[in-house]
Amino acid sequence: MIKFTGFCIFLTLFLFCGACFAAGDKPIEVNGDQVEFFPKEKKVVGKGNVTIDYEGIRLTCDRIIVYSETKDAEAEGNVVMQTEGSELKGEKITYNFNTKVGAILKARAKSGEWYAFGDKIELLSNSAYKIMNGYMTSCGLLKPHYKIAAKTIMIDPADGKVSASDVAVKVGNTPIAYLPKYNFNLKTSGWPTIHVIPGSKSKWGAFALNSYRYEFDDKSSLTLRLDERSKWGLAEGLDYKYYLDGFGTGLLRTYYTNQRDVDRNEPVKGEEERYRIQARHRWDINDRAMAIMEYHRMSDATMIKDYFYREEYEREASPESYIYALDRQPEYSLSVLARKRVNHFQDVTERLPETRFNLKDQRLFDLPLYFKTDTTFTSLNKKTSDNADDLNVMRFDTYNKFTAPLKLVDFLSVAPFVGSRDTIYSRGLNGEEDELRTAFYTGVDLSTKFSRTYEASGRFLGVDFNKLHHIVTPTVEYRYIHQPSIDPSELGQFDDIDAIDQKSAFTLGLENRFQTKRMMGGSLKTVDLGYLLITGDYLYKPEGRGSQFSNVIGDLELTPFKWLRFESDTRYDPDTKDFQTWNTDLYINKSDDWQLGFGSRYEQNKITELTSELFYKLNNEWAYRVLGRYDLKEVEDNGHKLVNRFKDREITVIKDLHCWLAEASLSSSRDGGITFWMVMKLKASPKVPFDFKNYYPHPK
């Protein structure tokens, strides 16, 4: 009787808790509208709204059978399996909760912005899965606009790797390309494998820029370029991104064309060989040592400007070739730089090599005295494009500085210093050998900080504030350089070291910062409302003249709202009473539906320019972007003045095509003429390998 009663209690508790059994030390619980346990077959059967949560996996279905000993499961009817980074759906699934291996029939998978379909999806033990006779797409429709169909597709959601074989790229059900193998990374890939950008440009004529990318793995890829320009002809290129295990990453880029110019008034159109070769490599040897190499070879001075204006020329018009190695230690740094002119049309100061040793501030014994040194040894050779006489010299330079920082009172920091710079030249400008130049330095840095917190909170002129905090930081720096033993006019000028001259100047600075607290992410955080910095140099009797202010610089930043930012910076010359530069920027980004930017650029006797950009989303399908640059005045290199003319005008119309974005752009440039181009972008991977757009420099 006791045995029978104990058995009944055990059975009652078992049924009350649902179908719950041990999987090693981890129980599996089956929940549903109807759950039954069959002791003889050692299985649990669930029906209706079945749910299992087990070790990061959530499985839902209409019906399921789970075997307690083997941990095998068979589920059918609206099967959904959710794992970290992916979701799988199908008609029927067989799965082992212990080995994590299984299969889904008539399956559909989702990982990030990508979808996959197949007759069968095999679940592998490492959380990856294999799709049989299926396809991938970023279009979520049951009949996608495009798809990458393949016999087999391997997907690993953890690192985003995709590997497909026997591939057909289809638009609708129409194949447009066949590939034996296709590797892709859902997390790191910048643009689709095949890209075509058609358009028209005044200098080029009609064009089609084509690229094909093949990924060897997530760290190395090869991009082939084949571009046709009706006026200039065919051009081809290769971009190879690589990774060397233990030796860093790099990029090799080539581009070649036999350019013809149909605009030339010649009976026979000749061809001009033009090319570029670029190599970049970075090796982070450890957390304190690194090496960088760059090599830029071009056929002529305008190669980059003519073919890669937006992508490269505007950012770096004349790149130089060099090798640089740096070892950073807590007490010092040691570097070696080798810069060599590769292109004869460039003006380059070669350094073959330059070795630099920098000893950071080191305390001497237990004294309140610190010592630092900066020493370089350089072989200099200045080469010019006009083949003028080269200027070369061997230079050894060392700067040694002693500093005694202290606090006079609690709020005032003072740091007086003395130093000397000794420079040895293998020869002077007039041919003298072994020239020694010595310069004595001294000075003092003073700084303090005041702050006040206003407890009031509320709104002023629409700006919310909570306990306004005002910080004032005045600084004074004095620098004195005694007349060097050799005048700069007697030395070859390679950089700032050679231009050192007598100086006695104060640099005055006043920084104001306004801060408040705002609710961000569920907690109060400190944000800047405004920032103003004014600095100026006061020169004491320079070159026999009276003392005067010089080089007054102002920097203003206002962020009254998180969606609005205003910046302005200027440089003023009190001697001539002229502003040398003055730049302003206003940027509004209140929502995803519209953004507005407006800026002005002023450089004395060179340019006065206005720039504006507007992005506006009309509805869920249409948007447009307009950008303009207008020169109120520009002085060209030849002295010719341009007044009240547009420099650039550009408009882009954007159409949302569900999984694609179609863009049509028209631009007019004073230098490049009229350009029209069209781009189709995947929403899941919107980057393209070519760039024509003008950009508004958004405030930081």
Feature names for model-found ranges:
Residues 36-38, 65-67, 154, 514, ...:
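A generic structural motif
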